[in-house]
Design a protein with these regions (language model features):
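Extended, well-ordered protein cores
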Residues: 2-162, 178-184, 191, 219, ...
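Covalent nucleotidyltransferase core used to form phosphodiester bonds in nucleic acids
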Residues: 162-173
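Extended charged low-complexity segments that act as oligomerization/scaffolding linkers
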Residues: 183, 187, 193-196, 201-209
């Protein structure tokens, strides 16, 4: 990762024909971290320096596209409005340039002379971060930054914070004095961070700077700055600026969207046709397609007109503007993707007659699934091969990425691009589906509905509190079906982590829950190998799965935090859980789709006072 050159150096990044300048390397991160942790717009600390990761604008050539391989996932690309995705540049060993970064924050302090000012006023050498008045003492980037819920980012206004009571000369930062920052050492609180100025104003501490209205009370408004985008003009912004710690997770949260590669897009043919797809779409007859393929794929028999016709038909079927999809009402395009995956997981895709390039193999177990009937579990499916693409759509600041609307998502580029950063993982898993008639009968119980309604109310309140406009807050997805399946997936992952040798962090859940779906996929997937070697798939055999379910449900009947856990009216963040804690139902957050909320193990096993709320009560009493 490399910062921009000094101001006086001649930079030709804006010229698409000009080569990228060779700049000093500042560090390296894993490819997956460029999507989940250090993506576009995030702050990254390298040694004693701090940078913001540049955007993906093609005109500014911030990303080395020749080092960012193209990956295809047609269904997800169509929903996100791009043509394809790109892997982030490779690691330090193989990358020549990588991703560029820009220095941020720009305000620094010197630990020796305690001077606090913009970095240019220290007059450091090119690409250095030192105080020239203190024998090249390394400078310390500001611990505090300012952000708003629309994603804007700026330096903390130290001048206005210090001169709050002397606005005549200090509001514009022209008092003529020299500011300094020191630490009293009395405590680790903000009260020990002291700001002073040689102009004589009373010194102040940073205490109170994190209050929601601390900056607006001083007349500070968001300037709409986007330092991760080169040349981005300041936007008009109505959001209130907030003070944040530079290393806080609230400074940057990714908005990730993912999809599984399923037939007919999973056999590698779509990748071969990517450059020709727009042309193939324009043809209206099979004969035109055959003539074009003979010229474009001379000598390649794997690309047939029948296969192309099948892909074109599938694309029309998946079109969100189709009448069948329009009738779905408020169903989001991402939920449509889940429904397509659910249908394919239920129907399967056998290994026979499939080539080595097939990325989705899903088959039923050979043994009799009758042993699972007491659990209300339909025939499981063994996903022996899968590929998932996870794309970075945008990012948010301050607001939770799941509770904020798209209007608060910060863009990755100044101008629209035809690609997005993404990573692909491959692995295997087990798909479990519950009998919907059993679920519907169980969900009609007033006791079950009351427990879930309390979760839903608390979750709705939390989403409204986090949203800038409560009217725009998303609606909680909590339903008896979702909470049950979500909790069951958690206890099953915990069981496999104890019995099958997989750490819980190596397994992930993928939920399929609405009025038309009732299942979940538990899978393991990695970006640097072809997944595991059948260890997860083996857990899906009916005999093993029945043993694991029985053991997991037995464990769920008792928690080391009981009776407090099972009797809790609410628990978790915002009261969005009931009987669930880290000792019984919670997972590492990388394994959970809902950040460990909307969980209630009482819906699995019941409570001592009312066993009837448990979906699996009959199995446990048998």
């Amino acid at each position: 990762m490399t910062p921009p050159p000094a101001r006086r150096s001649r930079r030709t990044d804006g010229d698409s024909a000009a080569p990228r300048l060779a700049l000093p390397r500042r560090g390296s991160v894993r490819r997956s971290q460029m999507i989940t942790t250090y993506g576009v717009g995030s702050l990254i600390a390298v040694d004693n320096e701090s940078f913001v990761v540049s955007g993906i604008d093609d005109a500014h050539r911030s990303w080395a596209l020749d080092e960012a391989p193209i990956i295809h996932e047609h269904r997800l690309a169509r929903v996100l409005g791009v043509k394809h995705f790109r892997l982030p540049p490779a690691s330090e060993d193989t990358s020549k340039d990588g991703v560029r970064v820009r220095r941020f924050p720009l305000w620094h302090s010197c630990p020796s002379c305690q001077c606090l000012q913009h970095i240019r006023d220290f007059n450091p050498p090119t690409n250095k971060n030192v105080c020239t008045d203190c024998d090249d003492e390394p400078l310390v980037p500001s611990r505090f930054v300012v952000a708003c819920e629309d994603g804007h980012l700026d330096d903390f206004p130290y001048w206005k914070w210090l001169h709050r009571k002397n606005r005549e000369d200090g509001a514009t930062g022209r008092c003529g004095g020299q500011m300094s920052m020191r630490f009293s050492g009395r405590s680790a609180s903000l009260r020990s961070v002291i700001i002073s100025c040689t102009c004589g104003v009373p010194e102040v501490s940073m205490e109170g700077s994190f209050r929601r209205s601390a900056l607006t009370d001083l007349g500070v408004r968001c300037e709409g700055r986007r330092p991760w985008l080169k040349g981005a003009p300041a936007e008009f912004c109505r959001q209130a600026p907030r003070t944040l710690q530079r290393g806080s997770s609230s400074v940057w949260q990714p908005v990730l969207k993912s999809a599984l590669s399923i037939p007919p897009w999973s056999d590698g043919l779509a990748a071969k046709l990517s450059e020709h797809w727009e042309t193939l779409r324009s043809f209206s007859s099979r004969m035109e397609i055959e003539i074009y393929l003979k010229g474009a794929f001379r000598g390649d028999d794997s690309v047939t007109a029948d296969a192309v016709m099948e892909l074109l038909a599938a694309e029309q079927e998946e079109d969100p503007d189709r009448e069948s999809n329009a009738d779905a009402g408020a169903v989001s395009p991402y939920q449509v993707l889940r429904r397509q995956e659910y249908e394919r997981l239920c129907s399967g895709n056998a290994l026979r007659d499939k080539g080595r390039e097939e990325q989705f193999i899903c088959e039923p177990p050979v043994s009799n699934p009758a042993v699972l009937e007491p659990f209300g579990v339909a025939r499981p499916m063994l996903v022996k091969r899968l590929r998932e693409v996870r794309a970075l759509k945008a990012f948010t600041r301050i607001a939770d990425a799941e509770s904020s609307s798209e209007s608060h998502e910060a863009a990755l580029s100044l101008t629209p691009t035809d690609w997005l950063p993404a990573m692909e993982v491959s692995g295997e898993g087990v798909f479990v589906r519950l009998d919907e008639s059993w679920l519907d009968e169980w969900a009609e119980s007033p006791a079950v509905a009351a427990r879930v309604e309390q979760l839903r109310t608390n979750h709705d309140r939390m989403l409204q509190e986090r949203a800038t406009d409560p009217a725009e807050a998303p609606v909680s997805p909590a339903t008896p079906r979702l909470v049950l399946l979500h909790t069951l997936a958690h206890v099953l992952i915990n069981e496999w982590s104890l019995d099958a040798g997989y750490p819980a962090a190596a397994l992930r859940e993928r939920l399929y829950t609405d009025d038309t779906m009732a299942g979940f996929l538990i899978y393991t997937a990695t970006s640097d190998s072809a997944g595991s070697l059948g260890g997860v798939v083996a857990q899906g055999e009916p005999d093993r799965l029945a043993e694991a379910l029985h053991s997991a449900l037995r464990r769920a009947t008792w928690c080391s935090a009981d009776p407090l856990c099972i009797e809790a009216g609410t628990s978790g963040i915002g009261g969005a859980n009931r009987a669930a804690c880290h000792a019984c139902a919670m997972l590492p957050e990388t394994s959970c789709e809902y950040n460990n909320i909307l969980l209630d193990r009482a819906l699995l096993v019941g409570t001592p006072e009312d066993p009837s709320v448990g979906f699996f009560r009959q199995v446990l009493t048998a």
